[in-house]
From Swiss-Prot:
Skewed-composition ranges (Gly residues): 614-637
Name of one Pfam family that matches: HSP70
Lineage: Eukaryota, Fungi, Dikarya, Basidiomycota, Ustilaginomycotina
Segments of this protein annotated with the region Disordered: 611-645
Note, other: UMS2 is essential for vegetative growth.
GO molecular function, one term: ATP binding
Gene, per the UniProt record: UMS2
A GO biological-process term: protein refolding
PANTHER family: HEAT SHOCK PROTEIN 70KDA
Family: Belongs to the heat shock protein 70 family.
Keyword match ATP-binding: yes
Protein name: Heat shock 70 kDa protein 2
Amino acid sequence: MTKAIGIDLGTTYSCVAVWQNDRVEVIANDQGNRTTPSYVAFTDSERLIGDAAKNQVAMNPHNTVFDAKRLIGRKFDDAEVQSDMKHWPFEVTSVGGKPQIRIEYKGEKKTFTPEEISSMVLLKMRETAEAYLGGTVKDAVVTVPAYFNDSQRQATKDAGIISGLNVMRIINEPTAAAIAYGLDKKTEGEKNVLIFDLGGGTFDVSLLTIEEGIFEVKATAGDTHLGGEDFDNRLVNHFVQEFKRKNKKDLTTNARALRRLRTACERAKRTLSSAAQTTIEIDSLFEGIDFYTSITRARFEELCGDLFSHTIEPVEKVLRDSKIDKGSVHEIVLVGGSTRIPKVQKLLTDFFNGRELNKSINPDEAVAYGAAVQAAILSGDTSEKTQDLLLLDVAPLSMGIETAGGVFTPLIKRNTTVPTKKSEIFSTYADNQPGVLIQVFEGERARTKDNNLLGKFELSGIPPAPRGVPQIEVTFDVDANAILNVSAAEKGTGKSEKITIRNDKGRLSSEQIEEMLKQAEQFAEEDKQALERTQAKNGLESYIYNVRNTTNEPQLKDKLEAADKEALEKIVKEGIEWLDSNTTASTDELKDKQKEIEEQVNPIMTKIYSAAGGAPGGMPGGAPGAAPGGAAPGGDDGPTVEELD
């Protein structure tokens, strides 16, 4: 039986881990990296995910998609989506009020939902785990920022379904990090732990109490839109202005130049966590102009000063909400790559009056680590280390209904431990009112117009009665994924209705998910074909070059008759020319071409080797050398190439 995995689906990087042999193992991808860029690229011939996609982004900026997490579960006219679009080289359009990403793939324009892009990243994480575990993986726990609302959680779950995963549970990133921390530290008594999670695109602060394996989230706050990329943006804008001053040219008109600058800025930012100054050197950045400059840590801190200061507000908020003063916080745990920035650490240390910060867990891997532990528990792992863990999470926003006059009446308050169920009795507003409209909102404002509408439904068929007489019981039921079901029942008649928040909510319908699953399978098939084609091409190429090398081998040179040598040289020349002029040849065409060349080469080789007294070692069947990957080129299957660039 294959194991359940934990996936940290990040804005910029993702990570996958599994619980086995009584411990968590973070799984490295095919490039040997323990985190994988959350990037998907589309080219004329194939789809790339992860490192391969990020590595070619400067050459293909318009068709390389990243930051899907900043779009997932949001509306197109969301202010944050509109502001992000200024920084993205790919096109985002509105389809039915929802953002979709438009790219060109194999010469055709295609649109994808953020869920589909995220599902491709999840698929890559799943494949990484399958390669490591040697079997099919179906079950996973996927993490989201604590501050994600209902639609963002639903959309993340949908992405999991499209990637072919059974998402056992959606858990909050800081909670997962707390498990990673708590598992390492079996301590006596109750501990108040503050998790400070500043990642590539999101920021979360949570305050938990850990006591004898019970993790209870007391409060959570943050910004679903603050992270390392925002610091990169500040650097990019700074250098764009500098380039303009020095060269009187605006490089923002060129997506490739902007991307190369962004990559250099990201590298500079990382360097400044350990060095006081760093240089940026980019040859021929824009219109042939080289860009050489430097930046100090102090200047970087000044550029991002307001963003860094913002990180303290949610810390104050969780302390207020959980009614704990800062002196009572036992541990401050850092999670997320951006917590390596010295200024962020200093602000936090100063806020806690010089307290030591806890850096014992790897900030990049902690979330996936905790998710893997939770996955093991949910799939029935009973090892000594996991059996005592109990996770009590909270609802990030209050949920309730609209009552007379547009007033928001919450049934489930923010920071209530989930899963939870709450019922309240309401009545009619007018005499002989035949039905009621139940409108479900989430948010913290007193009036519904300032909150987020989750969905609505009608309960009709109420018998005529004076206002205030009918009794309508409204029930809110939040499951362990912080996903909501609402029902309303009229007590007199027993008539009831309930809402599946799906479509009003901007959730994908089951038909759309089906369609996307089909597309995902089609992509997987296309990826497989692209791989086979590359292998066939590499096989043919290496066969031709092996023939050329063989004709130049000193011990065979003398055995070759002039006519045969000429024939082989002609075959090699024509083969190379054919490859150059048939760059888009299909797998079958490549295999047929190899067969055709083999039929021309083999008789000549047989003649040489029989004259030389048998084939030299390593040339099975008289063919010139084995193709890479160890397969003899004589076979119909073509050689297999292990490594793809």
